[in-house]
């Protein structure tokens, strides 16, 4: 039940305040608008400070797992391409399913494809996933608080560029830290979307885990936030195709990179996962290549 409530709040906040990776990065590169990246970096900094403080007092355990560099590079690049095609990120699609048919198509395509890549196609995904690296501070054998300070300096610079402090970033960071303390993990969408499809298809309750409840809550929170703008506007056949392709590519990328933009950028960056800092530049590379051609 706790994860459902956290999901509702998370989905409501993202939908109500339009916290979207697609529009945020698009606005940064096209209009030099630093609002989103400023809020994102500030949220990551606050989470990082809170996470390592909680770990220092032995109140939580920060995850540490190895990952494949090649799989992350390929996956993040494919994810960025998919985000550009669908004109939405994963979180934006799930929290705005009643706003536009393209979001609904993207969300369904992503969830269904996640089930495929973790089902009959899993053996092909596993070819790329040879574990190699872990978290940055562990690899460098330094205190994580050194990296927290550097992240704080970057956040201050981006806040200066944006000329404002995001209250939403503070709220999301607090929400994330509460989830870590109460549940043991934070915001997650990719694996729960796979499990949601498997539960709906098989009716096996083993798939109905806390992550699925979080995703259900996220969708519900987005619906509540967007009730006044309920539309389900139709989309062109071309954008419909792009939404299907985008959802498929984002699922392929998330399967290889062990998570979507939320898990890898918003959350894993806060505990300095090498994977997160490899994911971001290659995702942006794929995103920008296609965005210029489909805009």
Residue ranges, per PLM feature:
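Membrane-interfacial helix-loop segments of redox and metal-homeostasis proteins
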Residues: 1-295
């Amino acid at each position: 039940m706790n994860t459902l409530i956290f999901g509702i709040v998370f989905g409501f906040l993202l939908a109500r305040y339009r916290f979207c990776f697609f529009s945020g990065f698009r606005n940064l590169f096209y209009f030099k608008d630093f609002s989103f990246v400023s809020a994102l970096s500030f949220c990551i900094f606050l989470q990082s400070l809170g996470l390592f403080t909680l770990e220092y007092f032995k109140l939580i355990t920060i995850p540490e797992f190895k990952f494949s560099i090649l799989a992350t590079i390929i996956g993040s690049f494919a994810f960025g391409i998919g985000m550009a095609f669908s004109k939405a990120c994963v979180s934006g699609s799930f929290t705005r399913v009643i706003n536009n048919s393209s979001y609904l198509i993207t969300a369904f395509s992503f969830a269904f494809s996640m089930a495929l890549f973790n089902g009959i196609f899993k053996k092909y995904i596993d070819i790329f996933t040879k574990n190699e690296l872990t978290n940055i501070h562990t690899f460098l054998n330094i205190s994580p608080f050194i990296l927290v300070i550097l992240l704080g300096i970057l956040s201050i610079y981006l806040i200066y560029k944006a000329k404002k402090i995001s209250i939403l970033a503070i709220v999301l960071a607090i929400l994330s830290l509460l989830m870590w303390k109460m549940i043991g993990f934070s915001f997650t969408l990719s694996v729960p979307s796979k499990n949601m499809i498997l539960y709906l298809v098989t009716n096996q309750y083993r798939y109905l885990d806390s992550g699925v409840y979080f995703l259900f809550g996220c969708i519900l929170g987005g619906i509540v936030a967007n009730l006044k703008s309920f539309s389900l506007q139709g989309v062109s056949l071309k954008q419909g195709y792009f939404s299907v392709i985008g959802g498929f590519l984002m699922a392929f990328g998330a399967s290889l990179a062990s998570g979507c933009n939320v898990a890898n950028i918003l959350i894993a960056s806060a505990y300095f996962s090498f994977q997160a800092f490899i994911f971001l530049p290659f995702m942006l590379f794929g995103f920008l290549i296609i965005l210029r051609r489909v805009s």
